Amino acid sequence: MEQRKCYFCGQMLEPGTGKLYIKKDGSTYFMCSSKCMSNFALGRLPRRTEWTEKGKIQLKKA
């Protein structure tokens, strides 16, 4: 089975877990939790959120 990565926080997802968000244009996003889903829906950027993988990298540079 294929492992997927959470679109928002970057955490690896086990097969059969997580949530799938599909936009009207057909693009799909895999989320690991409702925390990631709600932050994505609110329009927050992963690079500005401290607890995400992208945020940790971005904030180290600053």
UniProtKB/Swiss-Prot annotation:
Pfam families: Ribosomal_L24e (PF01246)
InterPro entries, A to Z: L24e/L24_sf, Ribosomal_eL24-rel_arc, Ribosomal_eL24-rel_N, Ribosomal_eL24_CS, TRASH_dom
C4-type Zn finger ranges: 6-36
Binding site for Zn(2+): 6, 9, 32, 36
GO MF: rRNA binding; structural constituent of ribosome; zinc ion binding
Coiled-coil ranges from the UniProt annotation: none
SUPFAM superfamilies per the UniProt record, alphabetical: Glucocorticoid receptor-like (DNA-binding domain) (SSF57716)
Keywords: Metal-binding, Ribonucleoprotein, Ribosomal protein, RNA-binding, rRNA-binding, Zinc, Zinc-finger
CDD domains: Ribosomal_L24e_L24
Gene Ontology terms describing biological process: translation
GO CC annotation: ribonucleoprotein complex; ribosome
Cofactor note: Binds 1 zinc ion per subunit.
Its job: Binds to the 23S rRNA.
Family: Belongs to the eukaryotic ribosomal protein eL24 family.
Subunit field text: Part of the 50S ribosomal subunit. Forms a cluster with proteins L3 and L14.
HAMAP family associated with the record: Ribosomal_eL24
Name under which the protein is recorded: Large ribosomal subunit protein eL24
